[in-house]
A protein has these predicted regions:
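Solvent-exposed interhelical
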Residues: 182
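Hydrophobic alpha-helical transmembrane segments
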Residues: 1-172, 177, 185-319
């Protein structure tokens, strides 16, 4: 991918986002996962069989997605190069989620600012997996900030990283990995073994992007507040490993330090409380103004990640 193509994809995502009425590769990937799970589960029972079948589904969807997209772009370019480039731009934009992430989080903030707590809970439920029906204002604020931090990596920096590294096919492979993890990478009775390969692959795919994202959060904070870089850096390096996720802990701890707020605590999933470690334990809990600041940090980190990708692509092109 060239820097100009990446720029067009990034701007298209900023302008349009991902309207629900538009076709989207991730929806097709989700359909493939659902369609493949049923027959594969009939192939055997027990932990070993479930793991093998889940690994087969994971590898088939990830490699198949990348191959189909690669052949599609090549085929269109062979017949009409400008149209092929346009398809590459659109597919690249579909891998990114800056506009959607900021819009969804902003909708929750607006509901909080106008004291529509129930509306804020409903909007929040669109972007988090935890139970939202009984959350108070501060708990909603924390949930939004944690989602912004984690989704900065999953929805923006990681796709940019893979677009820069291997173009649209590799970024689509990443989105397939991420989709598989969200659909079957759960630690419950149904998916503990069937989804283990997907969960491990997603962890591996996010090792570098999550740490780049955490560093970009530090850099973004430095542009907004004096001393924020050091605070974000120290909190990140100290607290990242406390988190159960090897990757979410990177961005959430960095964001906690960048904002000077405490993240983590008790979350409820399917009516079951789950205690998560405190990140930035010395700070106060977040409020609505902290979420506004988190939105700015996320937006600036996104732009910084895009600029970094363009620099790398230009360097490779001129080398």
């Amino acid at each position: 991918m060239r820097a100009g193509t990446l720029t067009a994809s990034y701007l298209l995502d900023w302008i349009l986002g991902d309207p629900e009425s538009y076709p989207h590769p991730v929806r097709l990937i989700g359909w493939a996962v659902e369609s493949g799970e049923r027959p594969l589960r009939r192939m055997g029972e027990g932990r070993k069989a479930e793991f093998i079948c889940g690994a087969l589904l994971t590898s088939s969807v990830v490699l198949g997605s990348a191959l189909v997209i690669s052949k599609l772009i090549q085929s269109i370019k062979a017949h009409h190069r400008p149209l092929g480039t346009a398809a590459e731009v659109w597919l690249g934009a579909s891998c990114l989620a800056t506009r959607n992430l900021l819009d969804e989080a902003n909708a929750v903030v607006k509901a909080l600012e106008t004291s529509h707590l129930e509306s804020a809970r409903l909007r929040l439920a669109r972007i988090v997996g935890r139970d939202t029906a009984a959350l108070n204002e501060n708990e909603i604020a924390r949930a939004v900030i944690e989602t912004l931090a984690e989704s900065l990596c999953d929805g923006i920096i990681a796709p940019l990283f893979y677009l820069t590294l291997g173009g649209v096919p590799l970024s689509i492979a990443y989105k397939a990995t991420n989709t598989l993890d969200s659909m079957i990478g759960h630690k419950d009775e149904r998916y503990e073994w069937f989804g283990k390969a997907a969960a491990r692959l997603d962890d591996a795919a996010n090792v570098l992007p999550s740490r780049i994202s955490a560093l970009l959060i530090c850099g973004s904070a430095a542009l907004m507040e004096r001393g924020a870089f050091q605070r974000a850096w120290m909190t990140w390096r100290r607290d990242a490993r406390k988190h159960a996720s090897p990757n979410a802990g990177q961005t959430e701890s960095s964001m906690a330090g960048a904002l000077g707020v405490q993240l983590g605590g008790i979350n409820t999933y399917n009516s079951e409380p789950v205690e998560t470690p405190l990140l930035g334990a010395e700070f106060e809990g977040p409020n609505v103004s902290a979420v506004r600041k988190a939105l700015r940090v996320t937006a600036v980190a996104s732009v910084m990640g895009f600029a970094l990708g363009c620099l790398v692509l230009n360097w490779r092109q001129n080398d």
